[in-house]
Design a protein with these regions (language model features):
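Histidine-rich, glycine-flanked metal-binding segment
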Residues: 1-53, 67
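Divalent metal-coordination and catalytic microenvironments
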Residues: 10, 28, 47, 58, ...
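Metal-associated gating/positioning segment near the N- to mid-region
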Residues: 48-113, 117
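Alpha-helix-loop-beta-strand connector modules within alpha/beta enzyme cores
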Residues: 51, 104-120, 169-188
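Hydrophobic faces of well-ordered beta-strands that scaffold small-molecule active sites
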Residues: 53-59, 90-92, 122-126, 148-150, ...
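Short, acidic/polar
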Residues: 71-79, 130-140
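Short, well-ordered coil/turn segments that N-cap beta-strands
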Residues: 87-88, 116-124, 144-146, 182-184
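Histidine/acidic residue-rich metal-binding segments in metalloenzymes
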Residues: 132-198
Length: 198
């Protein structure tokens, strides 16, 4: 069989270890791994690593901007940097942009901000904040977030409308109950505000 693409002589990372070998690709999928494979197109990967794309589970992107963070990392440079480093998918945190990703409207704004800018796949975390306990968590679930994030310690800039907010004990408890109904994870930035604010 001759595949569309063969990556030859690369250091291939396998479940059992690493080996210098060839990888055949057909229709965007790996169809064979072994020696002396042939393909219509051949890439010589001698001296290079051939591995599955990596997933970065914690990335902050500031598109669509907001407040003093407009010059921080956006989708164009952030996703290009990921691709350059071998990261093919990342999970975006719900804060550092205005508005924070805490309901249907803010999630749609975030998705729109990324249109035609992505060089890699992106999944979204939705925020659990005191202001989205009346439907926002469910809206985020319906919008396709992969999980949720909250902060126990003080966060966000209270002078910027729509910025991320930390939870108190009650909103954490209520938020956890709602997230549990979605079957998704809740990542907790776990600090103790009275200690961290000193």
């Amino acid at each position: 069989m001759q595949a569309e693409l063969v990556i030859k002589n690369g250091l291939v990372i396998l479940e059992t270890g690493e080996v210098i070998t060839d990888v055949a690709v057909q229709g965007g999928k790996i169809v064979a791994i072994g020696q002396d494979l042939s393909g219509e197109r051949v890439i010589d990967a001698t001296g290079l690593v051939v591995s599955p794309g990596m997933v970065d589970a914690h990335v902050h992107i500031t598109d669509p901007g907001g407040g003093y963070r407009d010059e921080w990392e956006g989708y164009v440079t952030g996703t290009a940097a990921c691709a350059k480093g071998g990261v093919t998918t990342f999970m975006e945190m719900p804060l550092n942009q205005i508005p924070a990703t805490v309901d249907k409207t803010s999630l749609e704004i975030k998705y729109k901000a990324g249109e035609n800018k992505l060089k890699v796949d992106v999944g979204s975390f939705g925020g659990v904040v005191p202001t989205n306990l009346a439907g926002g968590i469910q809206e985020l679930d319906e919008g396709g977030v992969s999980g949720y994030k909250c902060f126990l310690g003080t966060c966000g800039d209270r002078s910027i409308e729509g910025d991320f907010q930390n939870v108190d004990d009650y909103s954490l408890y209520e938020g956890m109950k709602q997230v549990a109904k979605t079957g998704k994870v809740l990542a907790i930035h776990a600090e103790n505000a009275p200690i961290t604010e000193k």
